[in-house]
Amino acid sequence: MEYEAERAEFRQAFEAAGIGRRVKRGDCWWPVRLGRSYYNAMDRLVVEVFRTEDLDIEHNFEYGKPVCFFSQTDGAVQLLPWTATVSYAEDERMVIVLPNEGVLSQLGSIERLGVGLGFDESTYRLMFQALDAVMTAREGRLAHLRDICHGGVRAQRSAAPAVPVSLPWLNAAQQEAVREVLRARDVMVVHGPPGTGKTTTLVEAVCEVLRREPQVMVCAQSNTAVDWISSQLADRGIGVLRIGNPTRVTESMLAHTYEHRFSAHPDYPALWSIRRNIRQLYSTPRKSRSRDFHQKVARLRERADELELRIRHSLFDNARVIASTLAGAAHPLLGGQHYHTLFIDEAAQALEAASWIAIQKADRVVFAGDHRQLPPTVKSRAAQTGGLAESL
């Protein structure tokens, strides 16, 4: 219901605003000219798009944003029934990742083509997948955590920590909360009204857990919340690796993003050189290519893949905290990753379905937040009535 409500709201707003108004806001290019299409270094099909009018208007397109193509016939706007993603955007040119080869011919058949910022369905898709996994789980940690969170099974606690915890800079309630986090085998909730030091307590809990575990995951519903708790941990000297779209990360956390760390890695210049060689090979006219062209490209790609994997493993091996939004926990970089402990900050503002995206990757989860503060944002009244506004 919420998905359909948001999708309908976007479509109505897109059509009601009119193309001219959206162009002036920088949310739309119309008309556009298609440039070349090719497979990029990540082996994704992309197409170049050039705007031909209103070149002086500053636009809002940037890396990672979803976009939708449309046509206009007799004043009526027709949205194409699929979304694409911005790979690169400059003043008059944009490179867009397409979902498949079939849509390319569809774009070429439209006379007056336009492109605008689109409705981001990716988070809903991830939530649907997470809910399906949770509901169908019959055994294992996911099924166990589901049964605990929904009251079917009691959460278990360990005995007192083997190493006594003394944190004199915390008050008695905060110290006890940290101890309870260490004792929790399955689920723990750290809650309290504003001003009680939840963030301070959570930071200390993460630090204490890291004395016992090599790595933890820290998530929140919003990028702002993730960056806040991550910055507090980074200030303590803890190695944080921030996963997510760098354009949505606060300036203070940019140096901790995967992309920044990747490009700063000692092996990156060698990888960049190999990728440049691949691009140069592809820039050679087809008639001038040598017989072993494909073998050369294959060898270079194999070396590039090996280097990229080595850099990735190095970054993850050296990080103590992996930080992302709840939806960001499904990032391809985190595929196959699993953590003993997951911390979810501002948990009262998190949609339950979004929480399960991250919980799938953990053996136990620590929720932190205040259930008396703002609930998750839900636009559909029917969805609110159905319980979507209730967080875990």
Could you tell me what each predicted segment is?
Residues 173, 184-190, 213-214, 320:
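Pre-Walker A (Motif I) flank of P-loop NTPase domains
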Residues 212-214, 222, 236, 313, ...:
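Conserved helicase motor core of SF1/SF2 NTP-dependent helicases
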Residues 169-170, 178-187, 209:
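Phosphate-binding P-loop
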Residues 196, 201, 205-234, 240-244:
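Conserved RecA-like ASCE P-loop NTPase motor core of nucleic-acid helicases/translocases
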Residues 1-63, 94:
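A helicase ATPase "motif cassette" and its flanking acidic/Ser/Thr-rich regulatory loops
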Residues 161-167, 254-340:
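Conserved helicase NTPase catalytic core signature
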Residues 192, 245, 346:
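The Walker A (P-loop) glycine that initiates the GxxxxGKT/S ATP-binding motif of P-loop NTPases
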Residues 58-179, 235, 252-276, 280:
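Pre-ATPase regulatory/linker segments immediately N-terminal to the P-loop/RecA-like helicase/translocase core
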